[in-house]
């Protein structure tokens, strides 16, 4: 019913669109738009050191540090590209623009706000990966209903075999509606709705968990499963953001969001204790329907005062969320030994699932913040918050378990211009963040742990080499409780973890023809474990990469207007494959390259793009603390065409 309504609205908007004129999807270019190398998403393009799932070795998404147009958003599922134009990861000096930052960094989703021009964009891509053909088709349109007052946008998307790392075959659909209403000069409202459906149509690939040995050599295509081994989810995001200019210079910003991730009855396969030859114990779990649902939002009042060359801004802020989850209740069955690449054909057995457990989290945070800017001298900020956090967990047959916390949270930051082009910055942040849930091989699988206090200190320099090229060099330290699987396979707190590191960014236009986005992070993720009778053991955490370098280059030869050559080099250092730090994976360097050509055909901007990824077909793995390993994606190619009518 919801999908039909979105389709009907989309077709109506498309039908009333006259001839068009302005580029939208054809002009998307993450390298050209990135301000630094710490993470930028534009449309389907993503570059930089960090992402919504990894910043300084932690996950901002898991921690709960997401924003939509700058306002707090508690994610059950991410808004899709029908309503989301992109995202920016803010750490270091770029995070100082937020009145209430977070220790793990902030990820700010930017909505695809419809404007005052008629535009219909079409994007189609075709990819090749071993025996797979990967398909993607997207249509987006925007229509001004009342010019300068109301514009509406809508989009539809279809993809096939784009989640090949997780499914033997998969398909997905996306739809979205968004509006931009500005009834007068003082009020703006942007409501939106996005829907995504993704499912495995050829079997969910088993998760591979390593034994006490080196990993075997395998690719994702070696991990197969029967067709009935299904997974899927249905995701909804809707809400609005609004700005209202109030009397006496006050500004009100507000956002209210509903995020839903529904998972029907599904299966998950595991190969446990895999040895160096690729043999392990094959197990499959069936889970009853589950969900994650959250209502969240933020109200912010802002008032600025100008005093000559100094500007003072006060923020009064309230954030809240109401989050519910249903999880667990699965039945795990074992099917003996299996060798990767030689999975048996199994008929679906009878599973005995039980009612899932449920948890609710309610949190309200109020705060006050101050920011000062002294032109030519620097800026400084500070904030104080008090949060009320309540989490209730209910298991079938057990009394509910309730936990409460009401800590004070605070942060302070400053940046000083040492010269016209050189600035030094520093900050201290105390926050409360979510730490994730138990992995699939834990006895308390999918159980979320309570939010905990976390700390971050960082400092660094920003140098404006030219007006179009900047360098950032920073130091950081983040402290959190450490949760992992113990010897009884129970996911619980085992100690503390500290990430200390150096991060570098060089981004911008080197010449009129050459753009560079280069970043490096040198990370020391250390665990202080106190689980063995009080004895303290210090180890290196598994998962975070000790040295990561990513360099994106884009060259636009002056001789061919509209042509751009792209290249990306990524270097990952050697890293531990097990929590005992007894085995290491070798470092790896991968190379991506591509070409894009943009021109206007009959007044229609059109972009052609050819990409090749992992061109040298490097074989390696990404490990995590639960002993799961995931192979690098194999060499693959993709051709795409985007046009704005």
Summary of predicted features, one role per range:
Residues 376-379, 477-479, 493-578:
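Gram-negative outer-membrane beta-barrel transporters
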Residues 314, 541-645:
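Conserved C-terminal beta-signal and adjacent last beta-strands/turns
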Residues 186-188, 192-236, 263-265, 271, ...:
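Flexible loop and strand-edge segments within Gram-negative outer membrane beta-barrel domains
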Residues 188, 234-262, 281-396, 417:
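Face-selective signature of the C-terminal outer-membrane beta-barrel domain
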Residues 36-37, 57, 63, 67-69, ...:
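A beta-strand signature from Gram-negative outer-membrane beta-barrel systems
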Residues 199-212, 322-331, 390, 414-458, ...:
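Surface-exposed extracellular loop regions of Gram-negative outer-membrane beta-barrel proteins
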Residues 128-203, 229-248:
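Transmembrane beta-barrel wall of Gram-negative outer-membrane proteins
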Residues 243-245, 251-257, 261-269, 417-425, ...:
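Membrane-embedded beta-barrel scaffold of Gram-negative outer-membrane proteins
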């Amino acid at each position: 019913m919801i999908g039909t309504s979105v389709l009907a609205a989309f077709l109506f908007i498309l039908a009333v669109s006259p001839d068009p004129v302005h580029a939208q999807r054809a002009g998307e270019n993450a390298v050209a738009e990135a301000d630094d190398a710490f993470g930028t998403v534009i449309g389907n393009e993503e570059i930089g050191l960090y992402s919504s799932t990894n910043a300084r070795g932690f996950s901002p998404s898991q921690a709960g540090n997401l924003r939509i147009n700058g306002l707090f958003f508690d994610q059950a599922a991410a808004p899709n590209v029908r309503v989301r134009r992109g995202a920016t990861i803010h750490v270091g000096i770029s995070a100082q623009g937020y009145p209430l930052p977070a220790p793990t960094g902030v990820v700010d989703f930017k909505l695809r706000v419809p404007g005052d021009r008629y535009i219909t964009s079409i994007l189609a891509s075709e990819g090749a990966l071993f025996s797979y053909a990967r398909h993607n088709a997207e249509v987006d349109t925007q229509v001004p209903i009342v010019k300068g007052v109301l514009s509406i946008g809508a989009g539809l998307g279809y993809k096939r075999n784009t989640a090949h790392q997780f499914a033997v075959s998969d398909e997905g659909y996306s739809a979205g509606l968004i509006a931009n209403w500005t009834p007068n000069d003082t009020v703006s409202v942007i409501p939106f709705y996005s829907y995504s459906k993704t499912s495995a149509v050829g079997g969910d690939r088993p998760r591979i968990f390593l034994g006490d040995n080196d990993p075997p050599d395998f690719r994702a295509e070696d991990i197969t499963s029967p067709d009935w081994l299904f997974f899927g989810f249905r995701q909804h995001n809707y809400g609005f953001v609004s700005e209202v200019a109030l009397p006496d210079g006050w500004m009100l910003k507000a956002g209210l969001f509903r995020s839903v991730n529904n998972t029907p009855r599904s299966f998950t396969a595991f190969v446990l204790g895999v040895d160096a030859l690729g043999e392990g114990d094959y197990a499959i779990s069936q889970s009853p329907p589950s969900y994650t649902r959250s209502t969240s939002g933020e109200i912010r009042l802002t008032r600025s005062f100008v005093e000559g060359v100094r500007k003072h801004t006060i923020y009064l802020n309230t954030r809240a969320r109401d989050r519910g989850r249903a999880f667990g209740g699965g039945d795990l069955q074992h099917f003996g030994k299996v060798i990767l690449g030689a999975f048996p054909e199994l008929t679906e057995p009878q599973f005995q699932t039980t009612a899932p457990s449920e948890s609710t989290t309610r949190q309200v945070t109020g705060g006050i913040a101050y920011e000062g800017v002294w032109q030519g001298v620097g800026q400084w900020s500070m904030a104080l918050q008090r949060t009320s956090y309540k989490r209730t967990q209910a298991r079938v047959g057990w009394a509910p378990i309730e936990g409460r916390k009401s800590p004070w949270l605070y942060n302070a930051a400053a940046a000083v211009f040492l010269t016209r082009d050189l600035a030094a910055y520093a900050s201290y942040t105390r926050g409360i963040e979510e730490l994730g849930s138990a992995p699939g091989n834990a006895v308390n699988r999918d159980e979320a742990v309570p939010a905990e206090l976390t700390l971050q200190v960082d400092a660094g320099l920003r140098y404006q080499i030219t007006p179009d090229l900047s360098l950032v060099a920073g130091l950081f330290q983040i402290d959190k409780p450490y949760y992992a699987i113990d010897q009884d396979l129970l996911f619980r707190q085992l100690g503390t973890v500290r990430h200390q590191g150096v991060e570098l960014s060089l981004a911008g236009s080197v010449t009129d023809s050459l753009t560079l986005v280069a970043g490096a992070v040198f990370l020391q993720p250390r665990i202080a474990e106190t689980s063995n009778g009080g004895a303290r053991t210090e180890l290196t955490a598994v998962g975070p990469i000790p040295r990561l370098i990513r360099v994106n280059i884009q060259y636009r030869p002056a001789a061919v207007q509209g042509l751009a050559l792209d290249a990306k080099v990524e270097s990952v250092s050697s890293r531990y494959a097990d929590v005992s730090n007894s085995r290491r994976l070798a470092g790896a360097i991968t190379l991506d390259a591509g070409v894009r050509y943009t021109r206007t055909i009959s007044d229609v901007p059109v972009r052609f793009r050819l990409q090749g990824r992992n061109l040298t077909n490097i074989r390696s793995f990404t490990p995590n603390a639960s002993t799961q390993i995931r192979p690098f994606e194999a060499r693959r190619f993709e051709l795409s065409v985007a046009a704005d009518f």
